[in-house]
Amino acid sequence: MLPSQSPAIFTVSRLNQTVRLLLEHEMGQVWISGEISNFTQPASGHWYFTLKDDTAQVRCAMFRNSNRRVTFRPQHGQQVLVRANITLYEPRGDYQIIVESMQPAGEGLLQQKYEQLKAKLQAEGLFDQQYKKPLPSPAHCVGVITSKTGAALHDILHVLKRRDPSLPVIIYPTAVQGDDAPGQIVRAIELANQRNECDVLIVGRGGGSLEDLWSFNDERVARAIFASRIPVVSAVGHETDVTIADFVADLRAPTPSAAAEVVSRNQQELLRQVQSTRQRLEMAMDYYLANRTRRFTQIHHRLQQQHPQLRLARQQTMLERLQKRMSFALENQLKRTGQQQQRLTQRLNQQNPQPKIHRAQTRIQQLEYRLAETLRVQLSATRERFGNAVTHLEAVSPLSTLARGYSVTTATDGNVLKKVKQVKAGEMLTTRLEDGWIESEVKNIQPVKKSRKKVH
C-alpha cells in the first residue's frame, strides 16, 4: 500500500536541469586559480581545457567571443586565474565551468604586462637608437636616483670614490619598491632636470625578483626617462635582469657598480696619460733644443775656420793632447806597478799559515760549544721525560691510592671484594693498608639500598 504523500520522482532530464539551475543561481560567478592541462581548440574557435591543482580537477570551456579578449595563448602547465560560471552540461550530466575571462597568475601576469608594455613603447619608438643621448666625457657631476639605504647606492659611491674622488655626486633619494616607488622615481627624474645640477643620471637599484624590480617596468618611469634632457644610465638589478627602463635609457649598465664605472674617469689612468704626454713634450723640447744647438755649433765652427788664429789654436790643442797622453801613460805605468806590488803582497800573505790556524781554532771552539749545548739540551730533555714518567707512575700506583686513606680487601680465595654478597658471616678477610695488612673476621653483613630519584 503506497503512503498518502508519495515522494517527488525526477526524470533524468529534470534532475540534471534542477542541478544546473541550483549551481548557476546559488554559486554565480567565482574566481578560480589552477594549472591548465588538456588544452584544445577545435575549428569552432572555442577553448576546452582542464583546470587542476594537486588533488582535484574540473573541466572548463571558454567560448570564442570570450577567449578573443585574452591577450596571451594558454599553454599546458601554465598557472592562470579565471572568472567563470559553474554549470552542468545536461545531456551528459557533466559538471563544468564556463570561463568568462583569463589572465596569468603571479609572475606570469607580470611577465605578460611587461611584454605588452615593451611592445607598446617599442612601437612608439621610445627604444630607437636615434633618441639615445651621448654620455658626457668627462662627467662633471653625477646624479644618483635610488634608495638612500640600499646596497646599490653604497656600490656606486664606493666605485666613484675609488676611480674619481673629486667627481661631485648628488643623490636624489627615492623608494625603489612598492606602490609609491614609480611616482617617486618620476618626481626625482623631473627634479634633477629642473635643478640641472648634473650632466648624467644613474637610475637603478640592487637585484631582486620580478615583483621587486617592477617599479622600473612602470610606464610612467619609462616615459620620464625618455623625456629627461639629462642622459640616463639604467642600473637595475643584476646582469640577467632586464627592465623597460633599460630599453628606454640612453645606456644600460648590467649592475650599479658598472654604471659608476661608465660615468666616471679613472684618475690613475688620467695621471698616466698626463705623465706620458709630459714625457713626450719634454722629449720634443729636448730634441728641438739639441737640434738648434747643433746648428749653432756648425755655424760657429764655419766662422772659426776663417779665423787667422785657427792654426795656432790647433797646434796648441795638439800640444795639450800630447801632454795629456804622456801624463796618462805615466799614471797608467805607475798604477800597473802598484797593482803588481799589491798582488805580490797578497800572494805572500796567503802563504802565511797563521790565518789558517786562527780559523781552525775558531772552528774548533764553535764545534765544542755546539757539542756542549747539544749535550745540555738532550740531558735536560731526558731529565724532564724521566720526571714526567715518575710523576705518571706515582699517579697510577695503587700505593698512592692507599696513601690517600683507601684500602683493598680480599677474601680467603684472594679475590678483591667489591660487593657484600661475595662474603658470609664468619669468613676471614685480609685488608691491605698503606703500611701493612689486617686480618679480620666478618661479624655482620648489612647491604646498603640505593635510592632512585624520581624524574618529574
From Swiss-Prot:
One of its GO terms (cellular component) is exodeoxyribonuclease VII complex. The gene is xseA. The keyword Kinase does not apply. Signal peptide: none annotated. It catalyses: Exonucleolytic cleavage in either 5'- to 3'- or 3'- to 5'-direction to yield nucleoside 5'-phosphates. Keywords: Cytoplasm, Exonuclease, Hydrolase, Nuclease. This is Exodeoxyribonuclease 7 large subunit. One of its GO terms (molecular function) is nucleic acid binding. It comes from the Bacteria. One of its GO terms (biological process) is DNA catabolic process. Bidirectionally degrades single-stranded DNA into large acid-insoluble oligonucleotides, which are then degraded further into small acid-soluble oligonucleotides. Heterooligomer composed of large and small subunits. It comes from Shigella boydii serotype 18 (strain CDC 3083-94 / BS512).
